Regions:
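Thiamine diphosphate
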Residues: 1-162, 166-168, 173, 183, ...
Length: 317
């Protein structure tokens, strides 16, 4: 596809776009209800309760918030919930699984500051396992947003989709990739760059790193495709298998533990169809620090992707 990627950060902050988008959803659809776990000031939604009685601060009580969302959904409304990533996943998982998933109540959950983007909030606030948890909820839909265009598109889609929908989103800047008129479809990925020697499948903040890695590899004469899956669940398995056969080497890149996330989903799909490698968090906890430090600390860099791609290509013999 034709992208607008230049490697230049967006002037818009995620939280500004998120607040504006939720306001638009509340304005456009009287069935939309916005629930927040006392973090409205962190995500650009602090003024919404002044305008909408359907914007509610549930306090620091995430499990209760998801229970409320299940009840609101059962009454025919369209709840959108927000908390920081770990509290929108592991803290309220039983309610997500039962009140939403098992109860067939349609809710959308926003988990902000996923993975290393939690930065100075530290390891307690740094979810490396949220995608893995949501993947175990039958029929759940998971999106790790690449830029604000994808974020807006997913939220407008999600409010009318059945089941549990989980979206990972940062609060600060992103790197624009998608034109505003991009047509997003659940379960359909995008080929951002084509290539023949290897394929990088990347999600969220790692899409930028993957594209930078592909540029560096191209300068060395190595042709690398870059795929953004859009939804990690359901995964575009046809596209994954197509590029496994085309390039014979697949490397995943994610801001998440290697266990249970994008790498796991891709490996489950491939079943030996290609040589594989991964760039992800190893089996460890998060820690405090600026994003640049954490990116290097956990090997979530374009240079590390370059190394893993070369190693994976070498496995082809």
């Amino acid at each position: 596809m034709n992208t607008i990627y230049t490697g230049t950060p967006d002037s818009r902050l995620y939280k500004e776009v998120l607040g504006k988008t939720i306001g638009e959803l509340l304005e456009a659809d009287e069935k939309v209800v916005y629930l927040d776990a006392d973090l409205m000031s962190c995500i650009g939604t602090a003024k919404l309760p002044d305008k909408f009685d359907r914007a509610v601060n549930c306090g620091i009580a995430e499990s209760n918030m998801i229970g409320i969302a299940g009840g609101v959904a059962a009454a025919g409304m369209k709840p959108i919930c927000h908390s920081f990533g770990p509290f929108a996943s592991r803290r309220c998982f039983d309610q997500l699984f039962l009140s939403a998933g098992y109860g067939k109540n349609d809710i959308t959950v926003i988990g902000s500051d996923p993975g290393i983007t939690a930065a100075f909030n530290g390891g307690t606030h740094m979810p490396f396992e949220d995608v893995a948890l949501y993947r175990t909820i039958p029929t759940a839909i998971i999106c790790d947003t690449t830029d604000v265009t994808m974020l807006r598109a997913f939220l407008f889609m999600a409010k009318d989709m059945p089941g549990v929908k989980f979206v990972r989103v940062g609060r600060k800047t992103s790197y624009p990739v998608y034109p505003e008129d991009t047509e997003f479809k659940v379960g359909k990925g995008f080929v951002l760059r084509d290539g023949t020697d290897a394929t990088i499948i990347a999600s969220g903040i790692m899409v930028h790193e993957a594209l930078q890695a592909a540029i560096k590899l191209e300068a060395e004469g190595i042709s690398v495709a870059v795929i953004d899956p859009f939804t990690i669940k359901p995964l575009d398995t046809e596209l994954v298998l197509e590029y496994a056969k085309k390039t014979g080497a697949i490397v995943t890149a994610e801001n998440h533990n290697k266990i249970g996330g994008l790498y796991s989903a891709v490996k489950e799909t491939l079943d030996g169809e290609a040589k594989t490698g991964y760039v992800a968090i190893e089996d460890e906890f998060g820690e405090v620090g600026p994003q640049d430090y954490l990116r290097t600390r956990f090997d979530l860099t374009d240079d590390h992707i370059v190394r893993v791609v070369k190693e994976t290509i070498a496995k082809k013999g």
